[in-house]
Curated annotation (Swiss-Prot):
PROSITE patterns: EXPANSIN_CBD (PS50843), EXPANSIN_EG45 (PS50842)
Primary location group: secreted
InterPro entries registered for this protein in UniProt: Expan_Lol_pI, Expansin, Expansin/allergen_DPBB_dom, Expansin_CBD, Expansin_CBD_sf, RlpA-like_DPBB, RlpA-like_sf
Cellular compartments annotated: Secreted, Cell wall; Membrane
Stated role: Causes loosening and extension of plant cell walls by disrupting non-covalent bonding between cellulose microfibrils and matrix glucans. No enzymatic activity has been found.
Organism field: Arabidopsis thaliana (Mouse-ear cress)
GO BP terms in the entry: anatomical structure morphogenesis; plant-type cell wall loosening
Annotated ranges, domain Expansin-like EG45: 44-159
Every Expansin-like CBD domain range: 169-248
Keywords, alphabetical: Cell wall, Cell wall biogenesis/degradation, Membrane, Secreted, Signal
Name by which UniProt lists this protein: Expansin-A11
Secretion signal span: 1-20
Family: Belongs to the expansin family. Expansin A subfamily.
Length: 252
């Protein structure tokens, strides 16, 4: 095989094609906001992304209610949220919509009724949005507005990122800045001295391996929830250390 054909074969192995992510239908819900005018209170969160600025999410984010969060499997998904002006002309900005990324969980509050403070109680479909995102669709004093939403494709700048946490025999990898479907179905990891090893979701967007991979270059194979797969060969160098973030040039 010629070098050019071999190169094409490697490239094809990195991208397993599926149909482009297709937006969902429209669904009704409600939205509130949190985190302050600069969204500083939204950092961290139940997906484990940490600093949402450095992770690529900025202020266009939201915490999802139980009905949407799916025990963390929805981390990274993108939603277009439109304020339902027909249902609330007082507090909705007419025709306004915004695309957010799911980065956190809005826990239920069973001490309060669903229609008066228990906004994130099951089975409600609710977005607790970063304040800057919410103010693109609603008037601040309204506090809560009815919305129409749909899941849409995520468009991210740069490649997928990997933050390596944990300790020896326990690699906890937070996978960030995922485009396309945004949410992840499965992950495998490969050290330069191992074969491919399946990882398991620990919590949020954190995936774990119990292999000893110190001193090895790390590769990942990620399949998103729409079935698209990308392979990130040697994206983490053998000199890696816990607590560091490593960026790829590959995106969905």
């Amino acid at each position: 095989m010629s070098k050019s054909l071999a190169g094409l074969a490697v490239l094809a192995a990195l991208f397993i094609a599926v149909d482009a992510f297709r937006p969902s239908g429209l669904t009704n819900g409600h939205a509130t906001f949190y985190g302050g005018s600069d969204a500083s209170g939204t950092m961290g969160g139940a997906c484990g992304y940490g600093d949402l600025y450095s992770a690529g999410y900025g202020t266009m984010t939201a915490a999802l209610s139980t009905a949407l969060f799916n025990d963390g499997a929805s981390c990274g998904e993108c939603y277009r949220i439109t304020c339902d002006h027909a249902a609330d002309s007082r507090w909705c900005l007419k025709g306004a919509s915004v695309v957010i990324t799911a980065t956190n969980f809005c826990p239920p509050n069973f001490a309060l009724p669903n229609n008066n403070g228990g906004w994130c109680n099951p089975p409600l479909k609710h977005f607790d949005m970063a304040q800057p995102a919410w103010e693109k669709i609603g008037i601040y004093r309204g506090g809560i507005v009815p919305v129409v939403f749909q899941r849409v494709s995520c468009y991210k700048k740069g490649g997928v990122r990997f933050r390596i946490n944990g300790r020896d025999y326990f690699e906890l990898v937070n996978i960030q800045n995922v485009g396309g479907a945004g949410s992840i179905k499965s992950v495998s990891i490969k050290g330069s001295k191992t074969g491919w090893l399946a990882m398991s979701r620990n919590w949020g967007a954190n995936w774990q391996s119990n292999a000893y991979l110190d001193g090895q270059a790390l590769s990942f194979s990620i399949t998103t929830t729409d079935g698209a797969t990308r392979v990130f060969l040697n994206v983490v160098p053998s000199s890696w250390s816990f607590g560091q973030i490593y960026s790829s040039n590959v995106q969905f």
